[in-house]
């Protein structure tokens, strides 16, 4: 039975997910806030700016700049916009859902964002829950894991996690996406999935910088492993399940983001390692680099939670204090010795 789905955000990931859901037989509206982009996509049946000329939109996929049209009778609303746009888009969605109230079952809200809101330090599901009251929606599901849009576009095998406080909702979303190249597992640890998704972008900037500086595999492996320790520490302090961080949304997403040229965060770090300045890097990228803003949020969270995050702090110094990368690397290596696993540290224990 086809499901009516609204995908909000026509960047690379939103477009690919909308295409996949259409392939799976669902009725999908892909919304963009940019009418010119919509007109071009309708004319060319492509999203060349984000995905190149080889990627073709499914004929049945409907692209629109009319948010009300996209949301009309939608059983599922999938947010695939940058973290800094989540709240504003949700605020546009809210009055439309209020007008639709009583016309049928409330929609399931799904998001695929990988970041934290600046200022509030909220996870994305928290932002959505703050804007969209319970009486307007069934609940919230997050999908996350090791995934680049470019690979999914060519039907490379990909596995993600669908996480929700309500397992039945996660299972419903799981069924929508599953096919012979795209597989979802379910999880109820929303905190862990969202923290892993957001903070791995910070570590990926560091991994890219190491590559740009010419460091080898040993160094990169050390950064990723100790970076995962930092992500786990802050996640567990916030109430996440430790096992989540060795799953798809933890170590899985960390690996793909820290090793792939498709990763915007890795590419940004690589450019910094080669000597480019951050404003120039962001301008040349032409797309959102979530890890830059997330670094600032994570730096503040570490202090508020009293969690040791030396790698995150080092990346913060490079991005926001113009510290030389080689200097912060030396400072990291000169820290006093400590055990690899500090199980007596309160930040490693679930509250």
Curated annotation (Swiss-Prot):
Sn-glycerol 3-phosphate binds at residues 114, 145, 147, 200, 253, 263-265. It is found in: Cytoplasm. GO terms for molecular function: glycerol-3-phosphate dehydrogenase [NAD(P)+] activity; NAD binding. The active site is at residue 200. SUPFAM superfamilies: 6-phosphogluconate dehydrogenase C-terminal domain-like, NAD(P)-binding Rossmann-fold domains. The keyword Ligase does not apply. Pfam families: NAD_Gly3P_dh_C, NAD_Gly3P_dh_N. GO terms for cellular component: cytosol. InterPro entries: 6-PGluconate_DH-like_C_sf, 6PGD_dom2, G3P_DH_NAD-dep, G3P_DH_NAD-dep_C, G3P_DH_NAD-dep_N, NAD(P)-bd_dom_sf. GO terms for biological process: carbohydrate metabolic process; glycerol-3-phosphate biosynthetic process; glycerol-3-phosphate catabolic process; glycerophospholipid metabolic process; phospholipid biosynthetic process. It catalyses: sn-glycerol 3-phosphate + NAD(+) = dihydroxyacetone phosphate + NADH + H(+); sn-glycerol 3-phosphate + NADP(+) = dihydroxyacetone phosphate + NADPH + H(+). It comes from the Bacteria. It is an enzyme of class 1 (oxidoreductase). Keywords: Cytoplasm, Lipid biosynthesis, Lipid metabolism, NAD, NADP, Nucleotide-binding, Oxidoreductase, Phospholipid biosynthesis, Phospholipid metabolism. Its EC number is 1.1.1.94. Pathway: Membrane lipid metabolism; glycerophospholipid metabolism. NADPH binds at residues 12-13, 33, 114, 149, 264, 288, 290. Its main location: cytoplasm. PROSITE patterns: NAD_G3PDH (PS00957). Belongs to the NAD-dependent glycerol-3-phosphate dehydrogenase family. Catalyzes the reduction of the glycolytic intermediate dihydroxyacetone phosphate (DHAP) to sn-glycerol 3-phosphate (G3P), the key precursor for phospholipid synthesis. HAMAP family: NAD_Glyc3P_dehydrog (MF_00394). This is Glycerol-3-phosphate dehydrogenase [NAD(P)+].
């Amino acid at each position: 039975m086809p499901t009516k789905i609204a995908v909000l955000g026509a960047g690379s990931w939103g477009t690919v997910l909308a295409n996949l859901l259409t392939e799976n037989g669902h009725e999908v509206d892909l919304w963009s806030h940019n009418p010119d982009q919509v007109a071009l996509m309708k004319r060319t049946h492509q999203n060349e700016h984000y995905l190149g000329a080889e990627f073709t939109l499914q004929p049945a996929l409907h692209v629109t700049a009319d948010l009300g049209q996209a949301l009309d009778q939608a059983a599922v609303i999938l947010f695939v916009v940058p973290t800094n746009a989540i709240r504003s888009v949700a605020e546009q969605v809210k009055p439309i859902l209020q007008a639709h109230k009583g016309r049928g079952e409330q929609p399931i809200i799904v998001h695929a964002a990988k970041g934290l809101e600046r200022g509030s330090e909220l996870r994305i599901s928290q932002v959505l829950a703050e804007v969209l009251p319970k009486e307007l929606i069934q609940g919230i599901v997050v999908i996350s894991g090791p995934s680049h849009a470019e690979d999914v576009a060519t039907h490379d095998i990909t596995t993600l996690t669908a996480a929700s406080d309500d397992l039945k909702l996660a299972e419903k979303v799981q069924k929508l996406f599953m096919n012979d190249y795209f597989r979802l597992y379910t999880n109820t640890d929303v905190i862990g999935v969202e923290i892993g998704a957001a903070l791995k972008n910070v570590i990926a900037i560091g991994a890219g910088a190491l590559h740009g500086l010419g460091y080898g595999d040993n160094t990169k492996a050390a950064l990723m492993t100790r970076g995962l320790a930092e992500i786990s520490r802050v996640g567990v302090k916030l109430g996440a399940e430790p096992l989540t961080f060795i799953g798809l949304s933890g170590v899985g997403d960390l690996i793909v983001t820290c090793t792939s040229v498709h990763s915007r965060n890795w590419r940004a770090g690589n450019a910094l390692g080669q000597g480019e300045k951050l404003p120039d890097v962001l301008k040349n990228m032409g797309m959102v680099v979530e890890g830059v803003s997330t670094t600032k949020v994570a730096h503040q969270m570490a202090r508020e939670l009293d969690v040791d995050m030396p790698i995150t702090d080092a990346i913060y110094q490079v991005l926001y204090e113009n510290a030389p990368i080689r200097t912060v690397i030396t400072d990291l290596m000169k820290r006093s010795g400590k055990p690899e696993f500090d199980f007596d540290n309160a930040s490693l224990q679930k509250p």
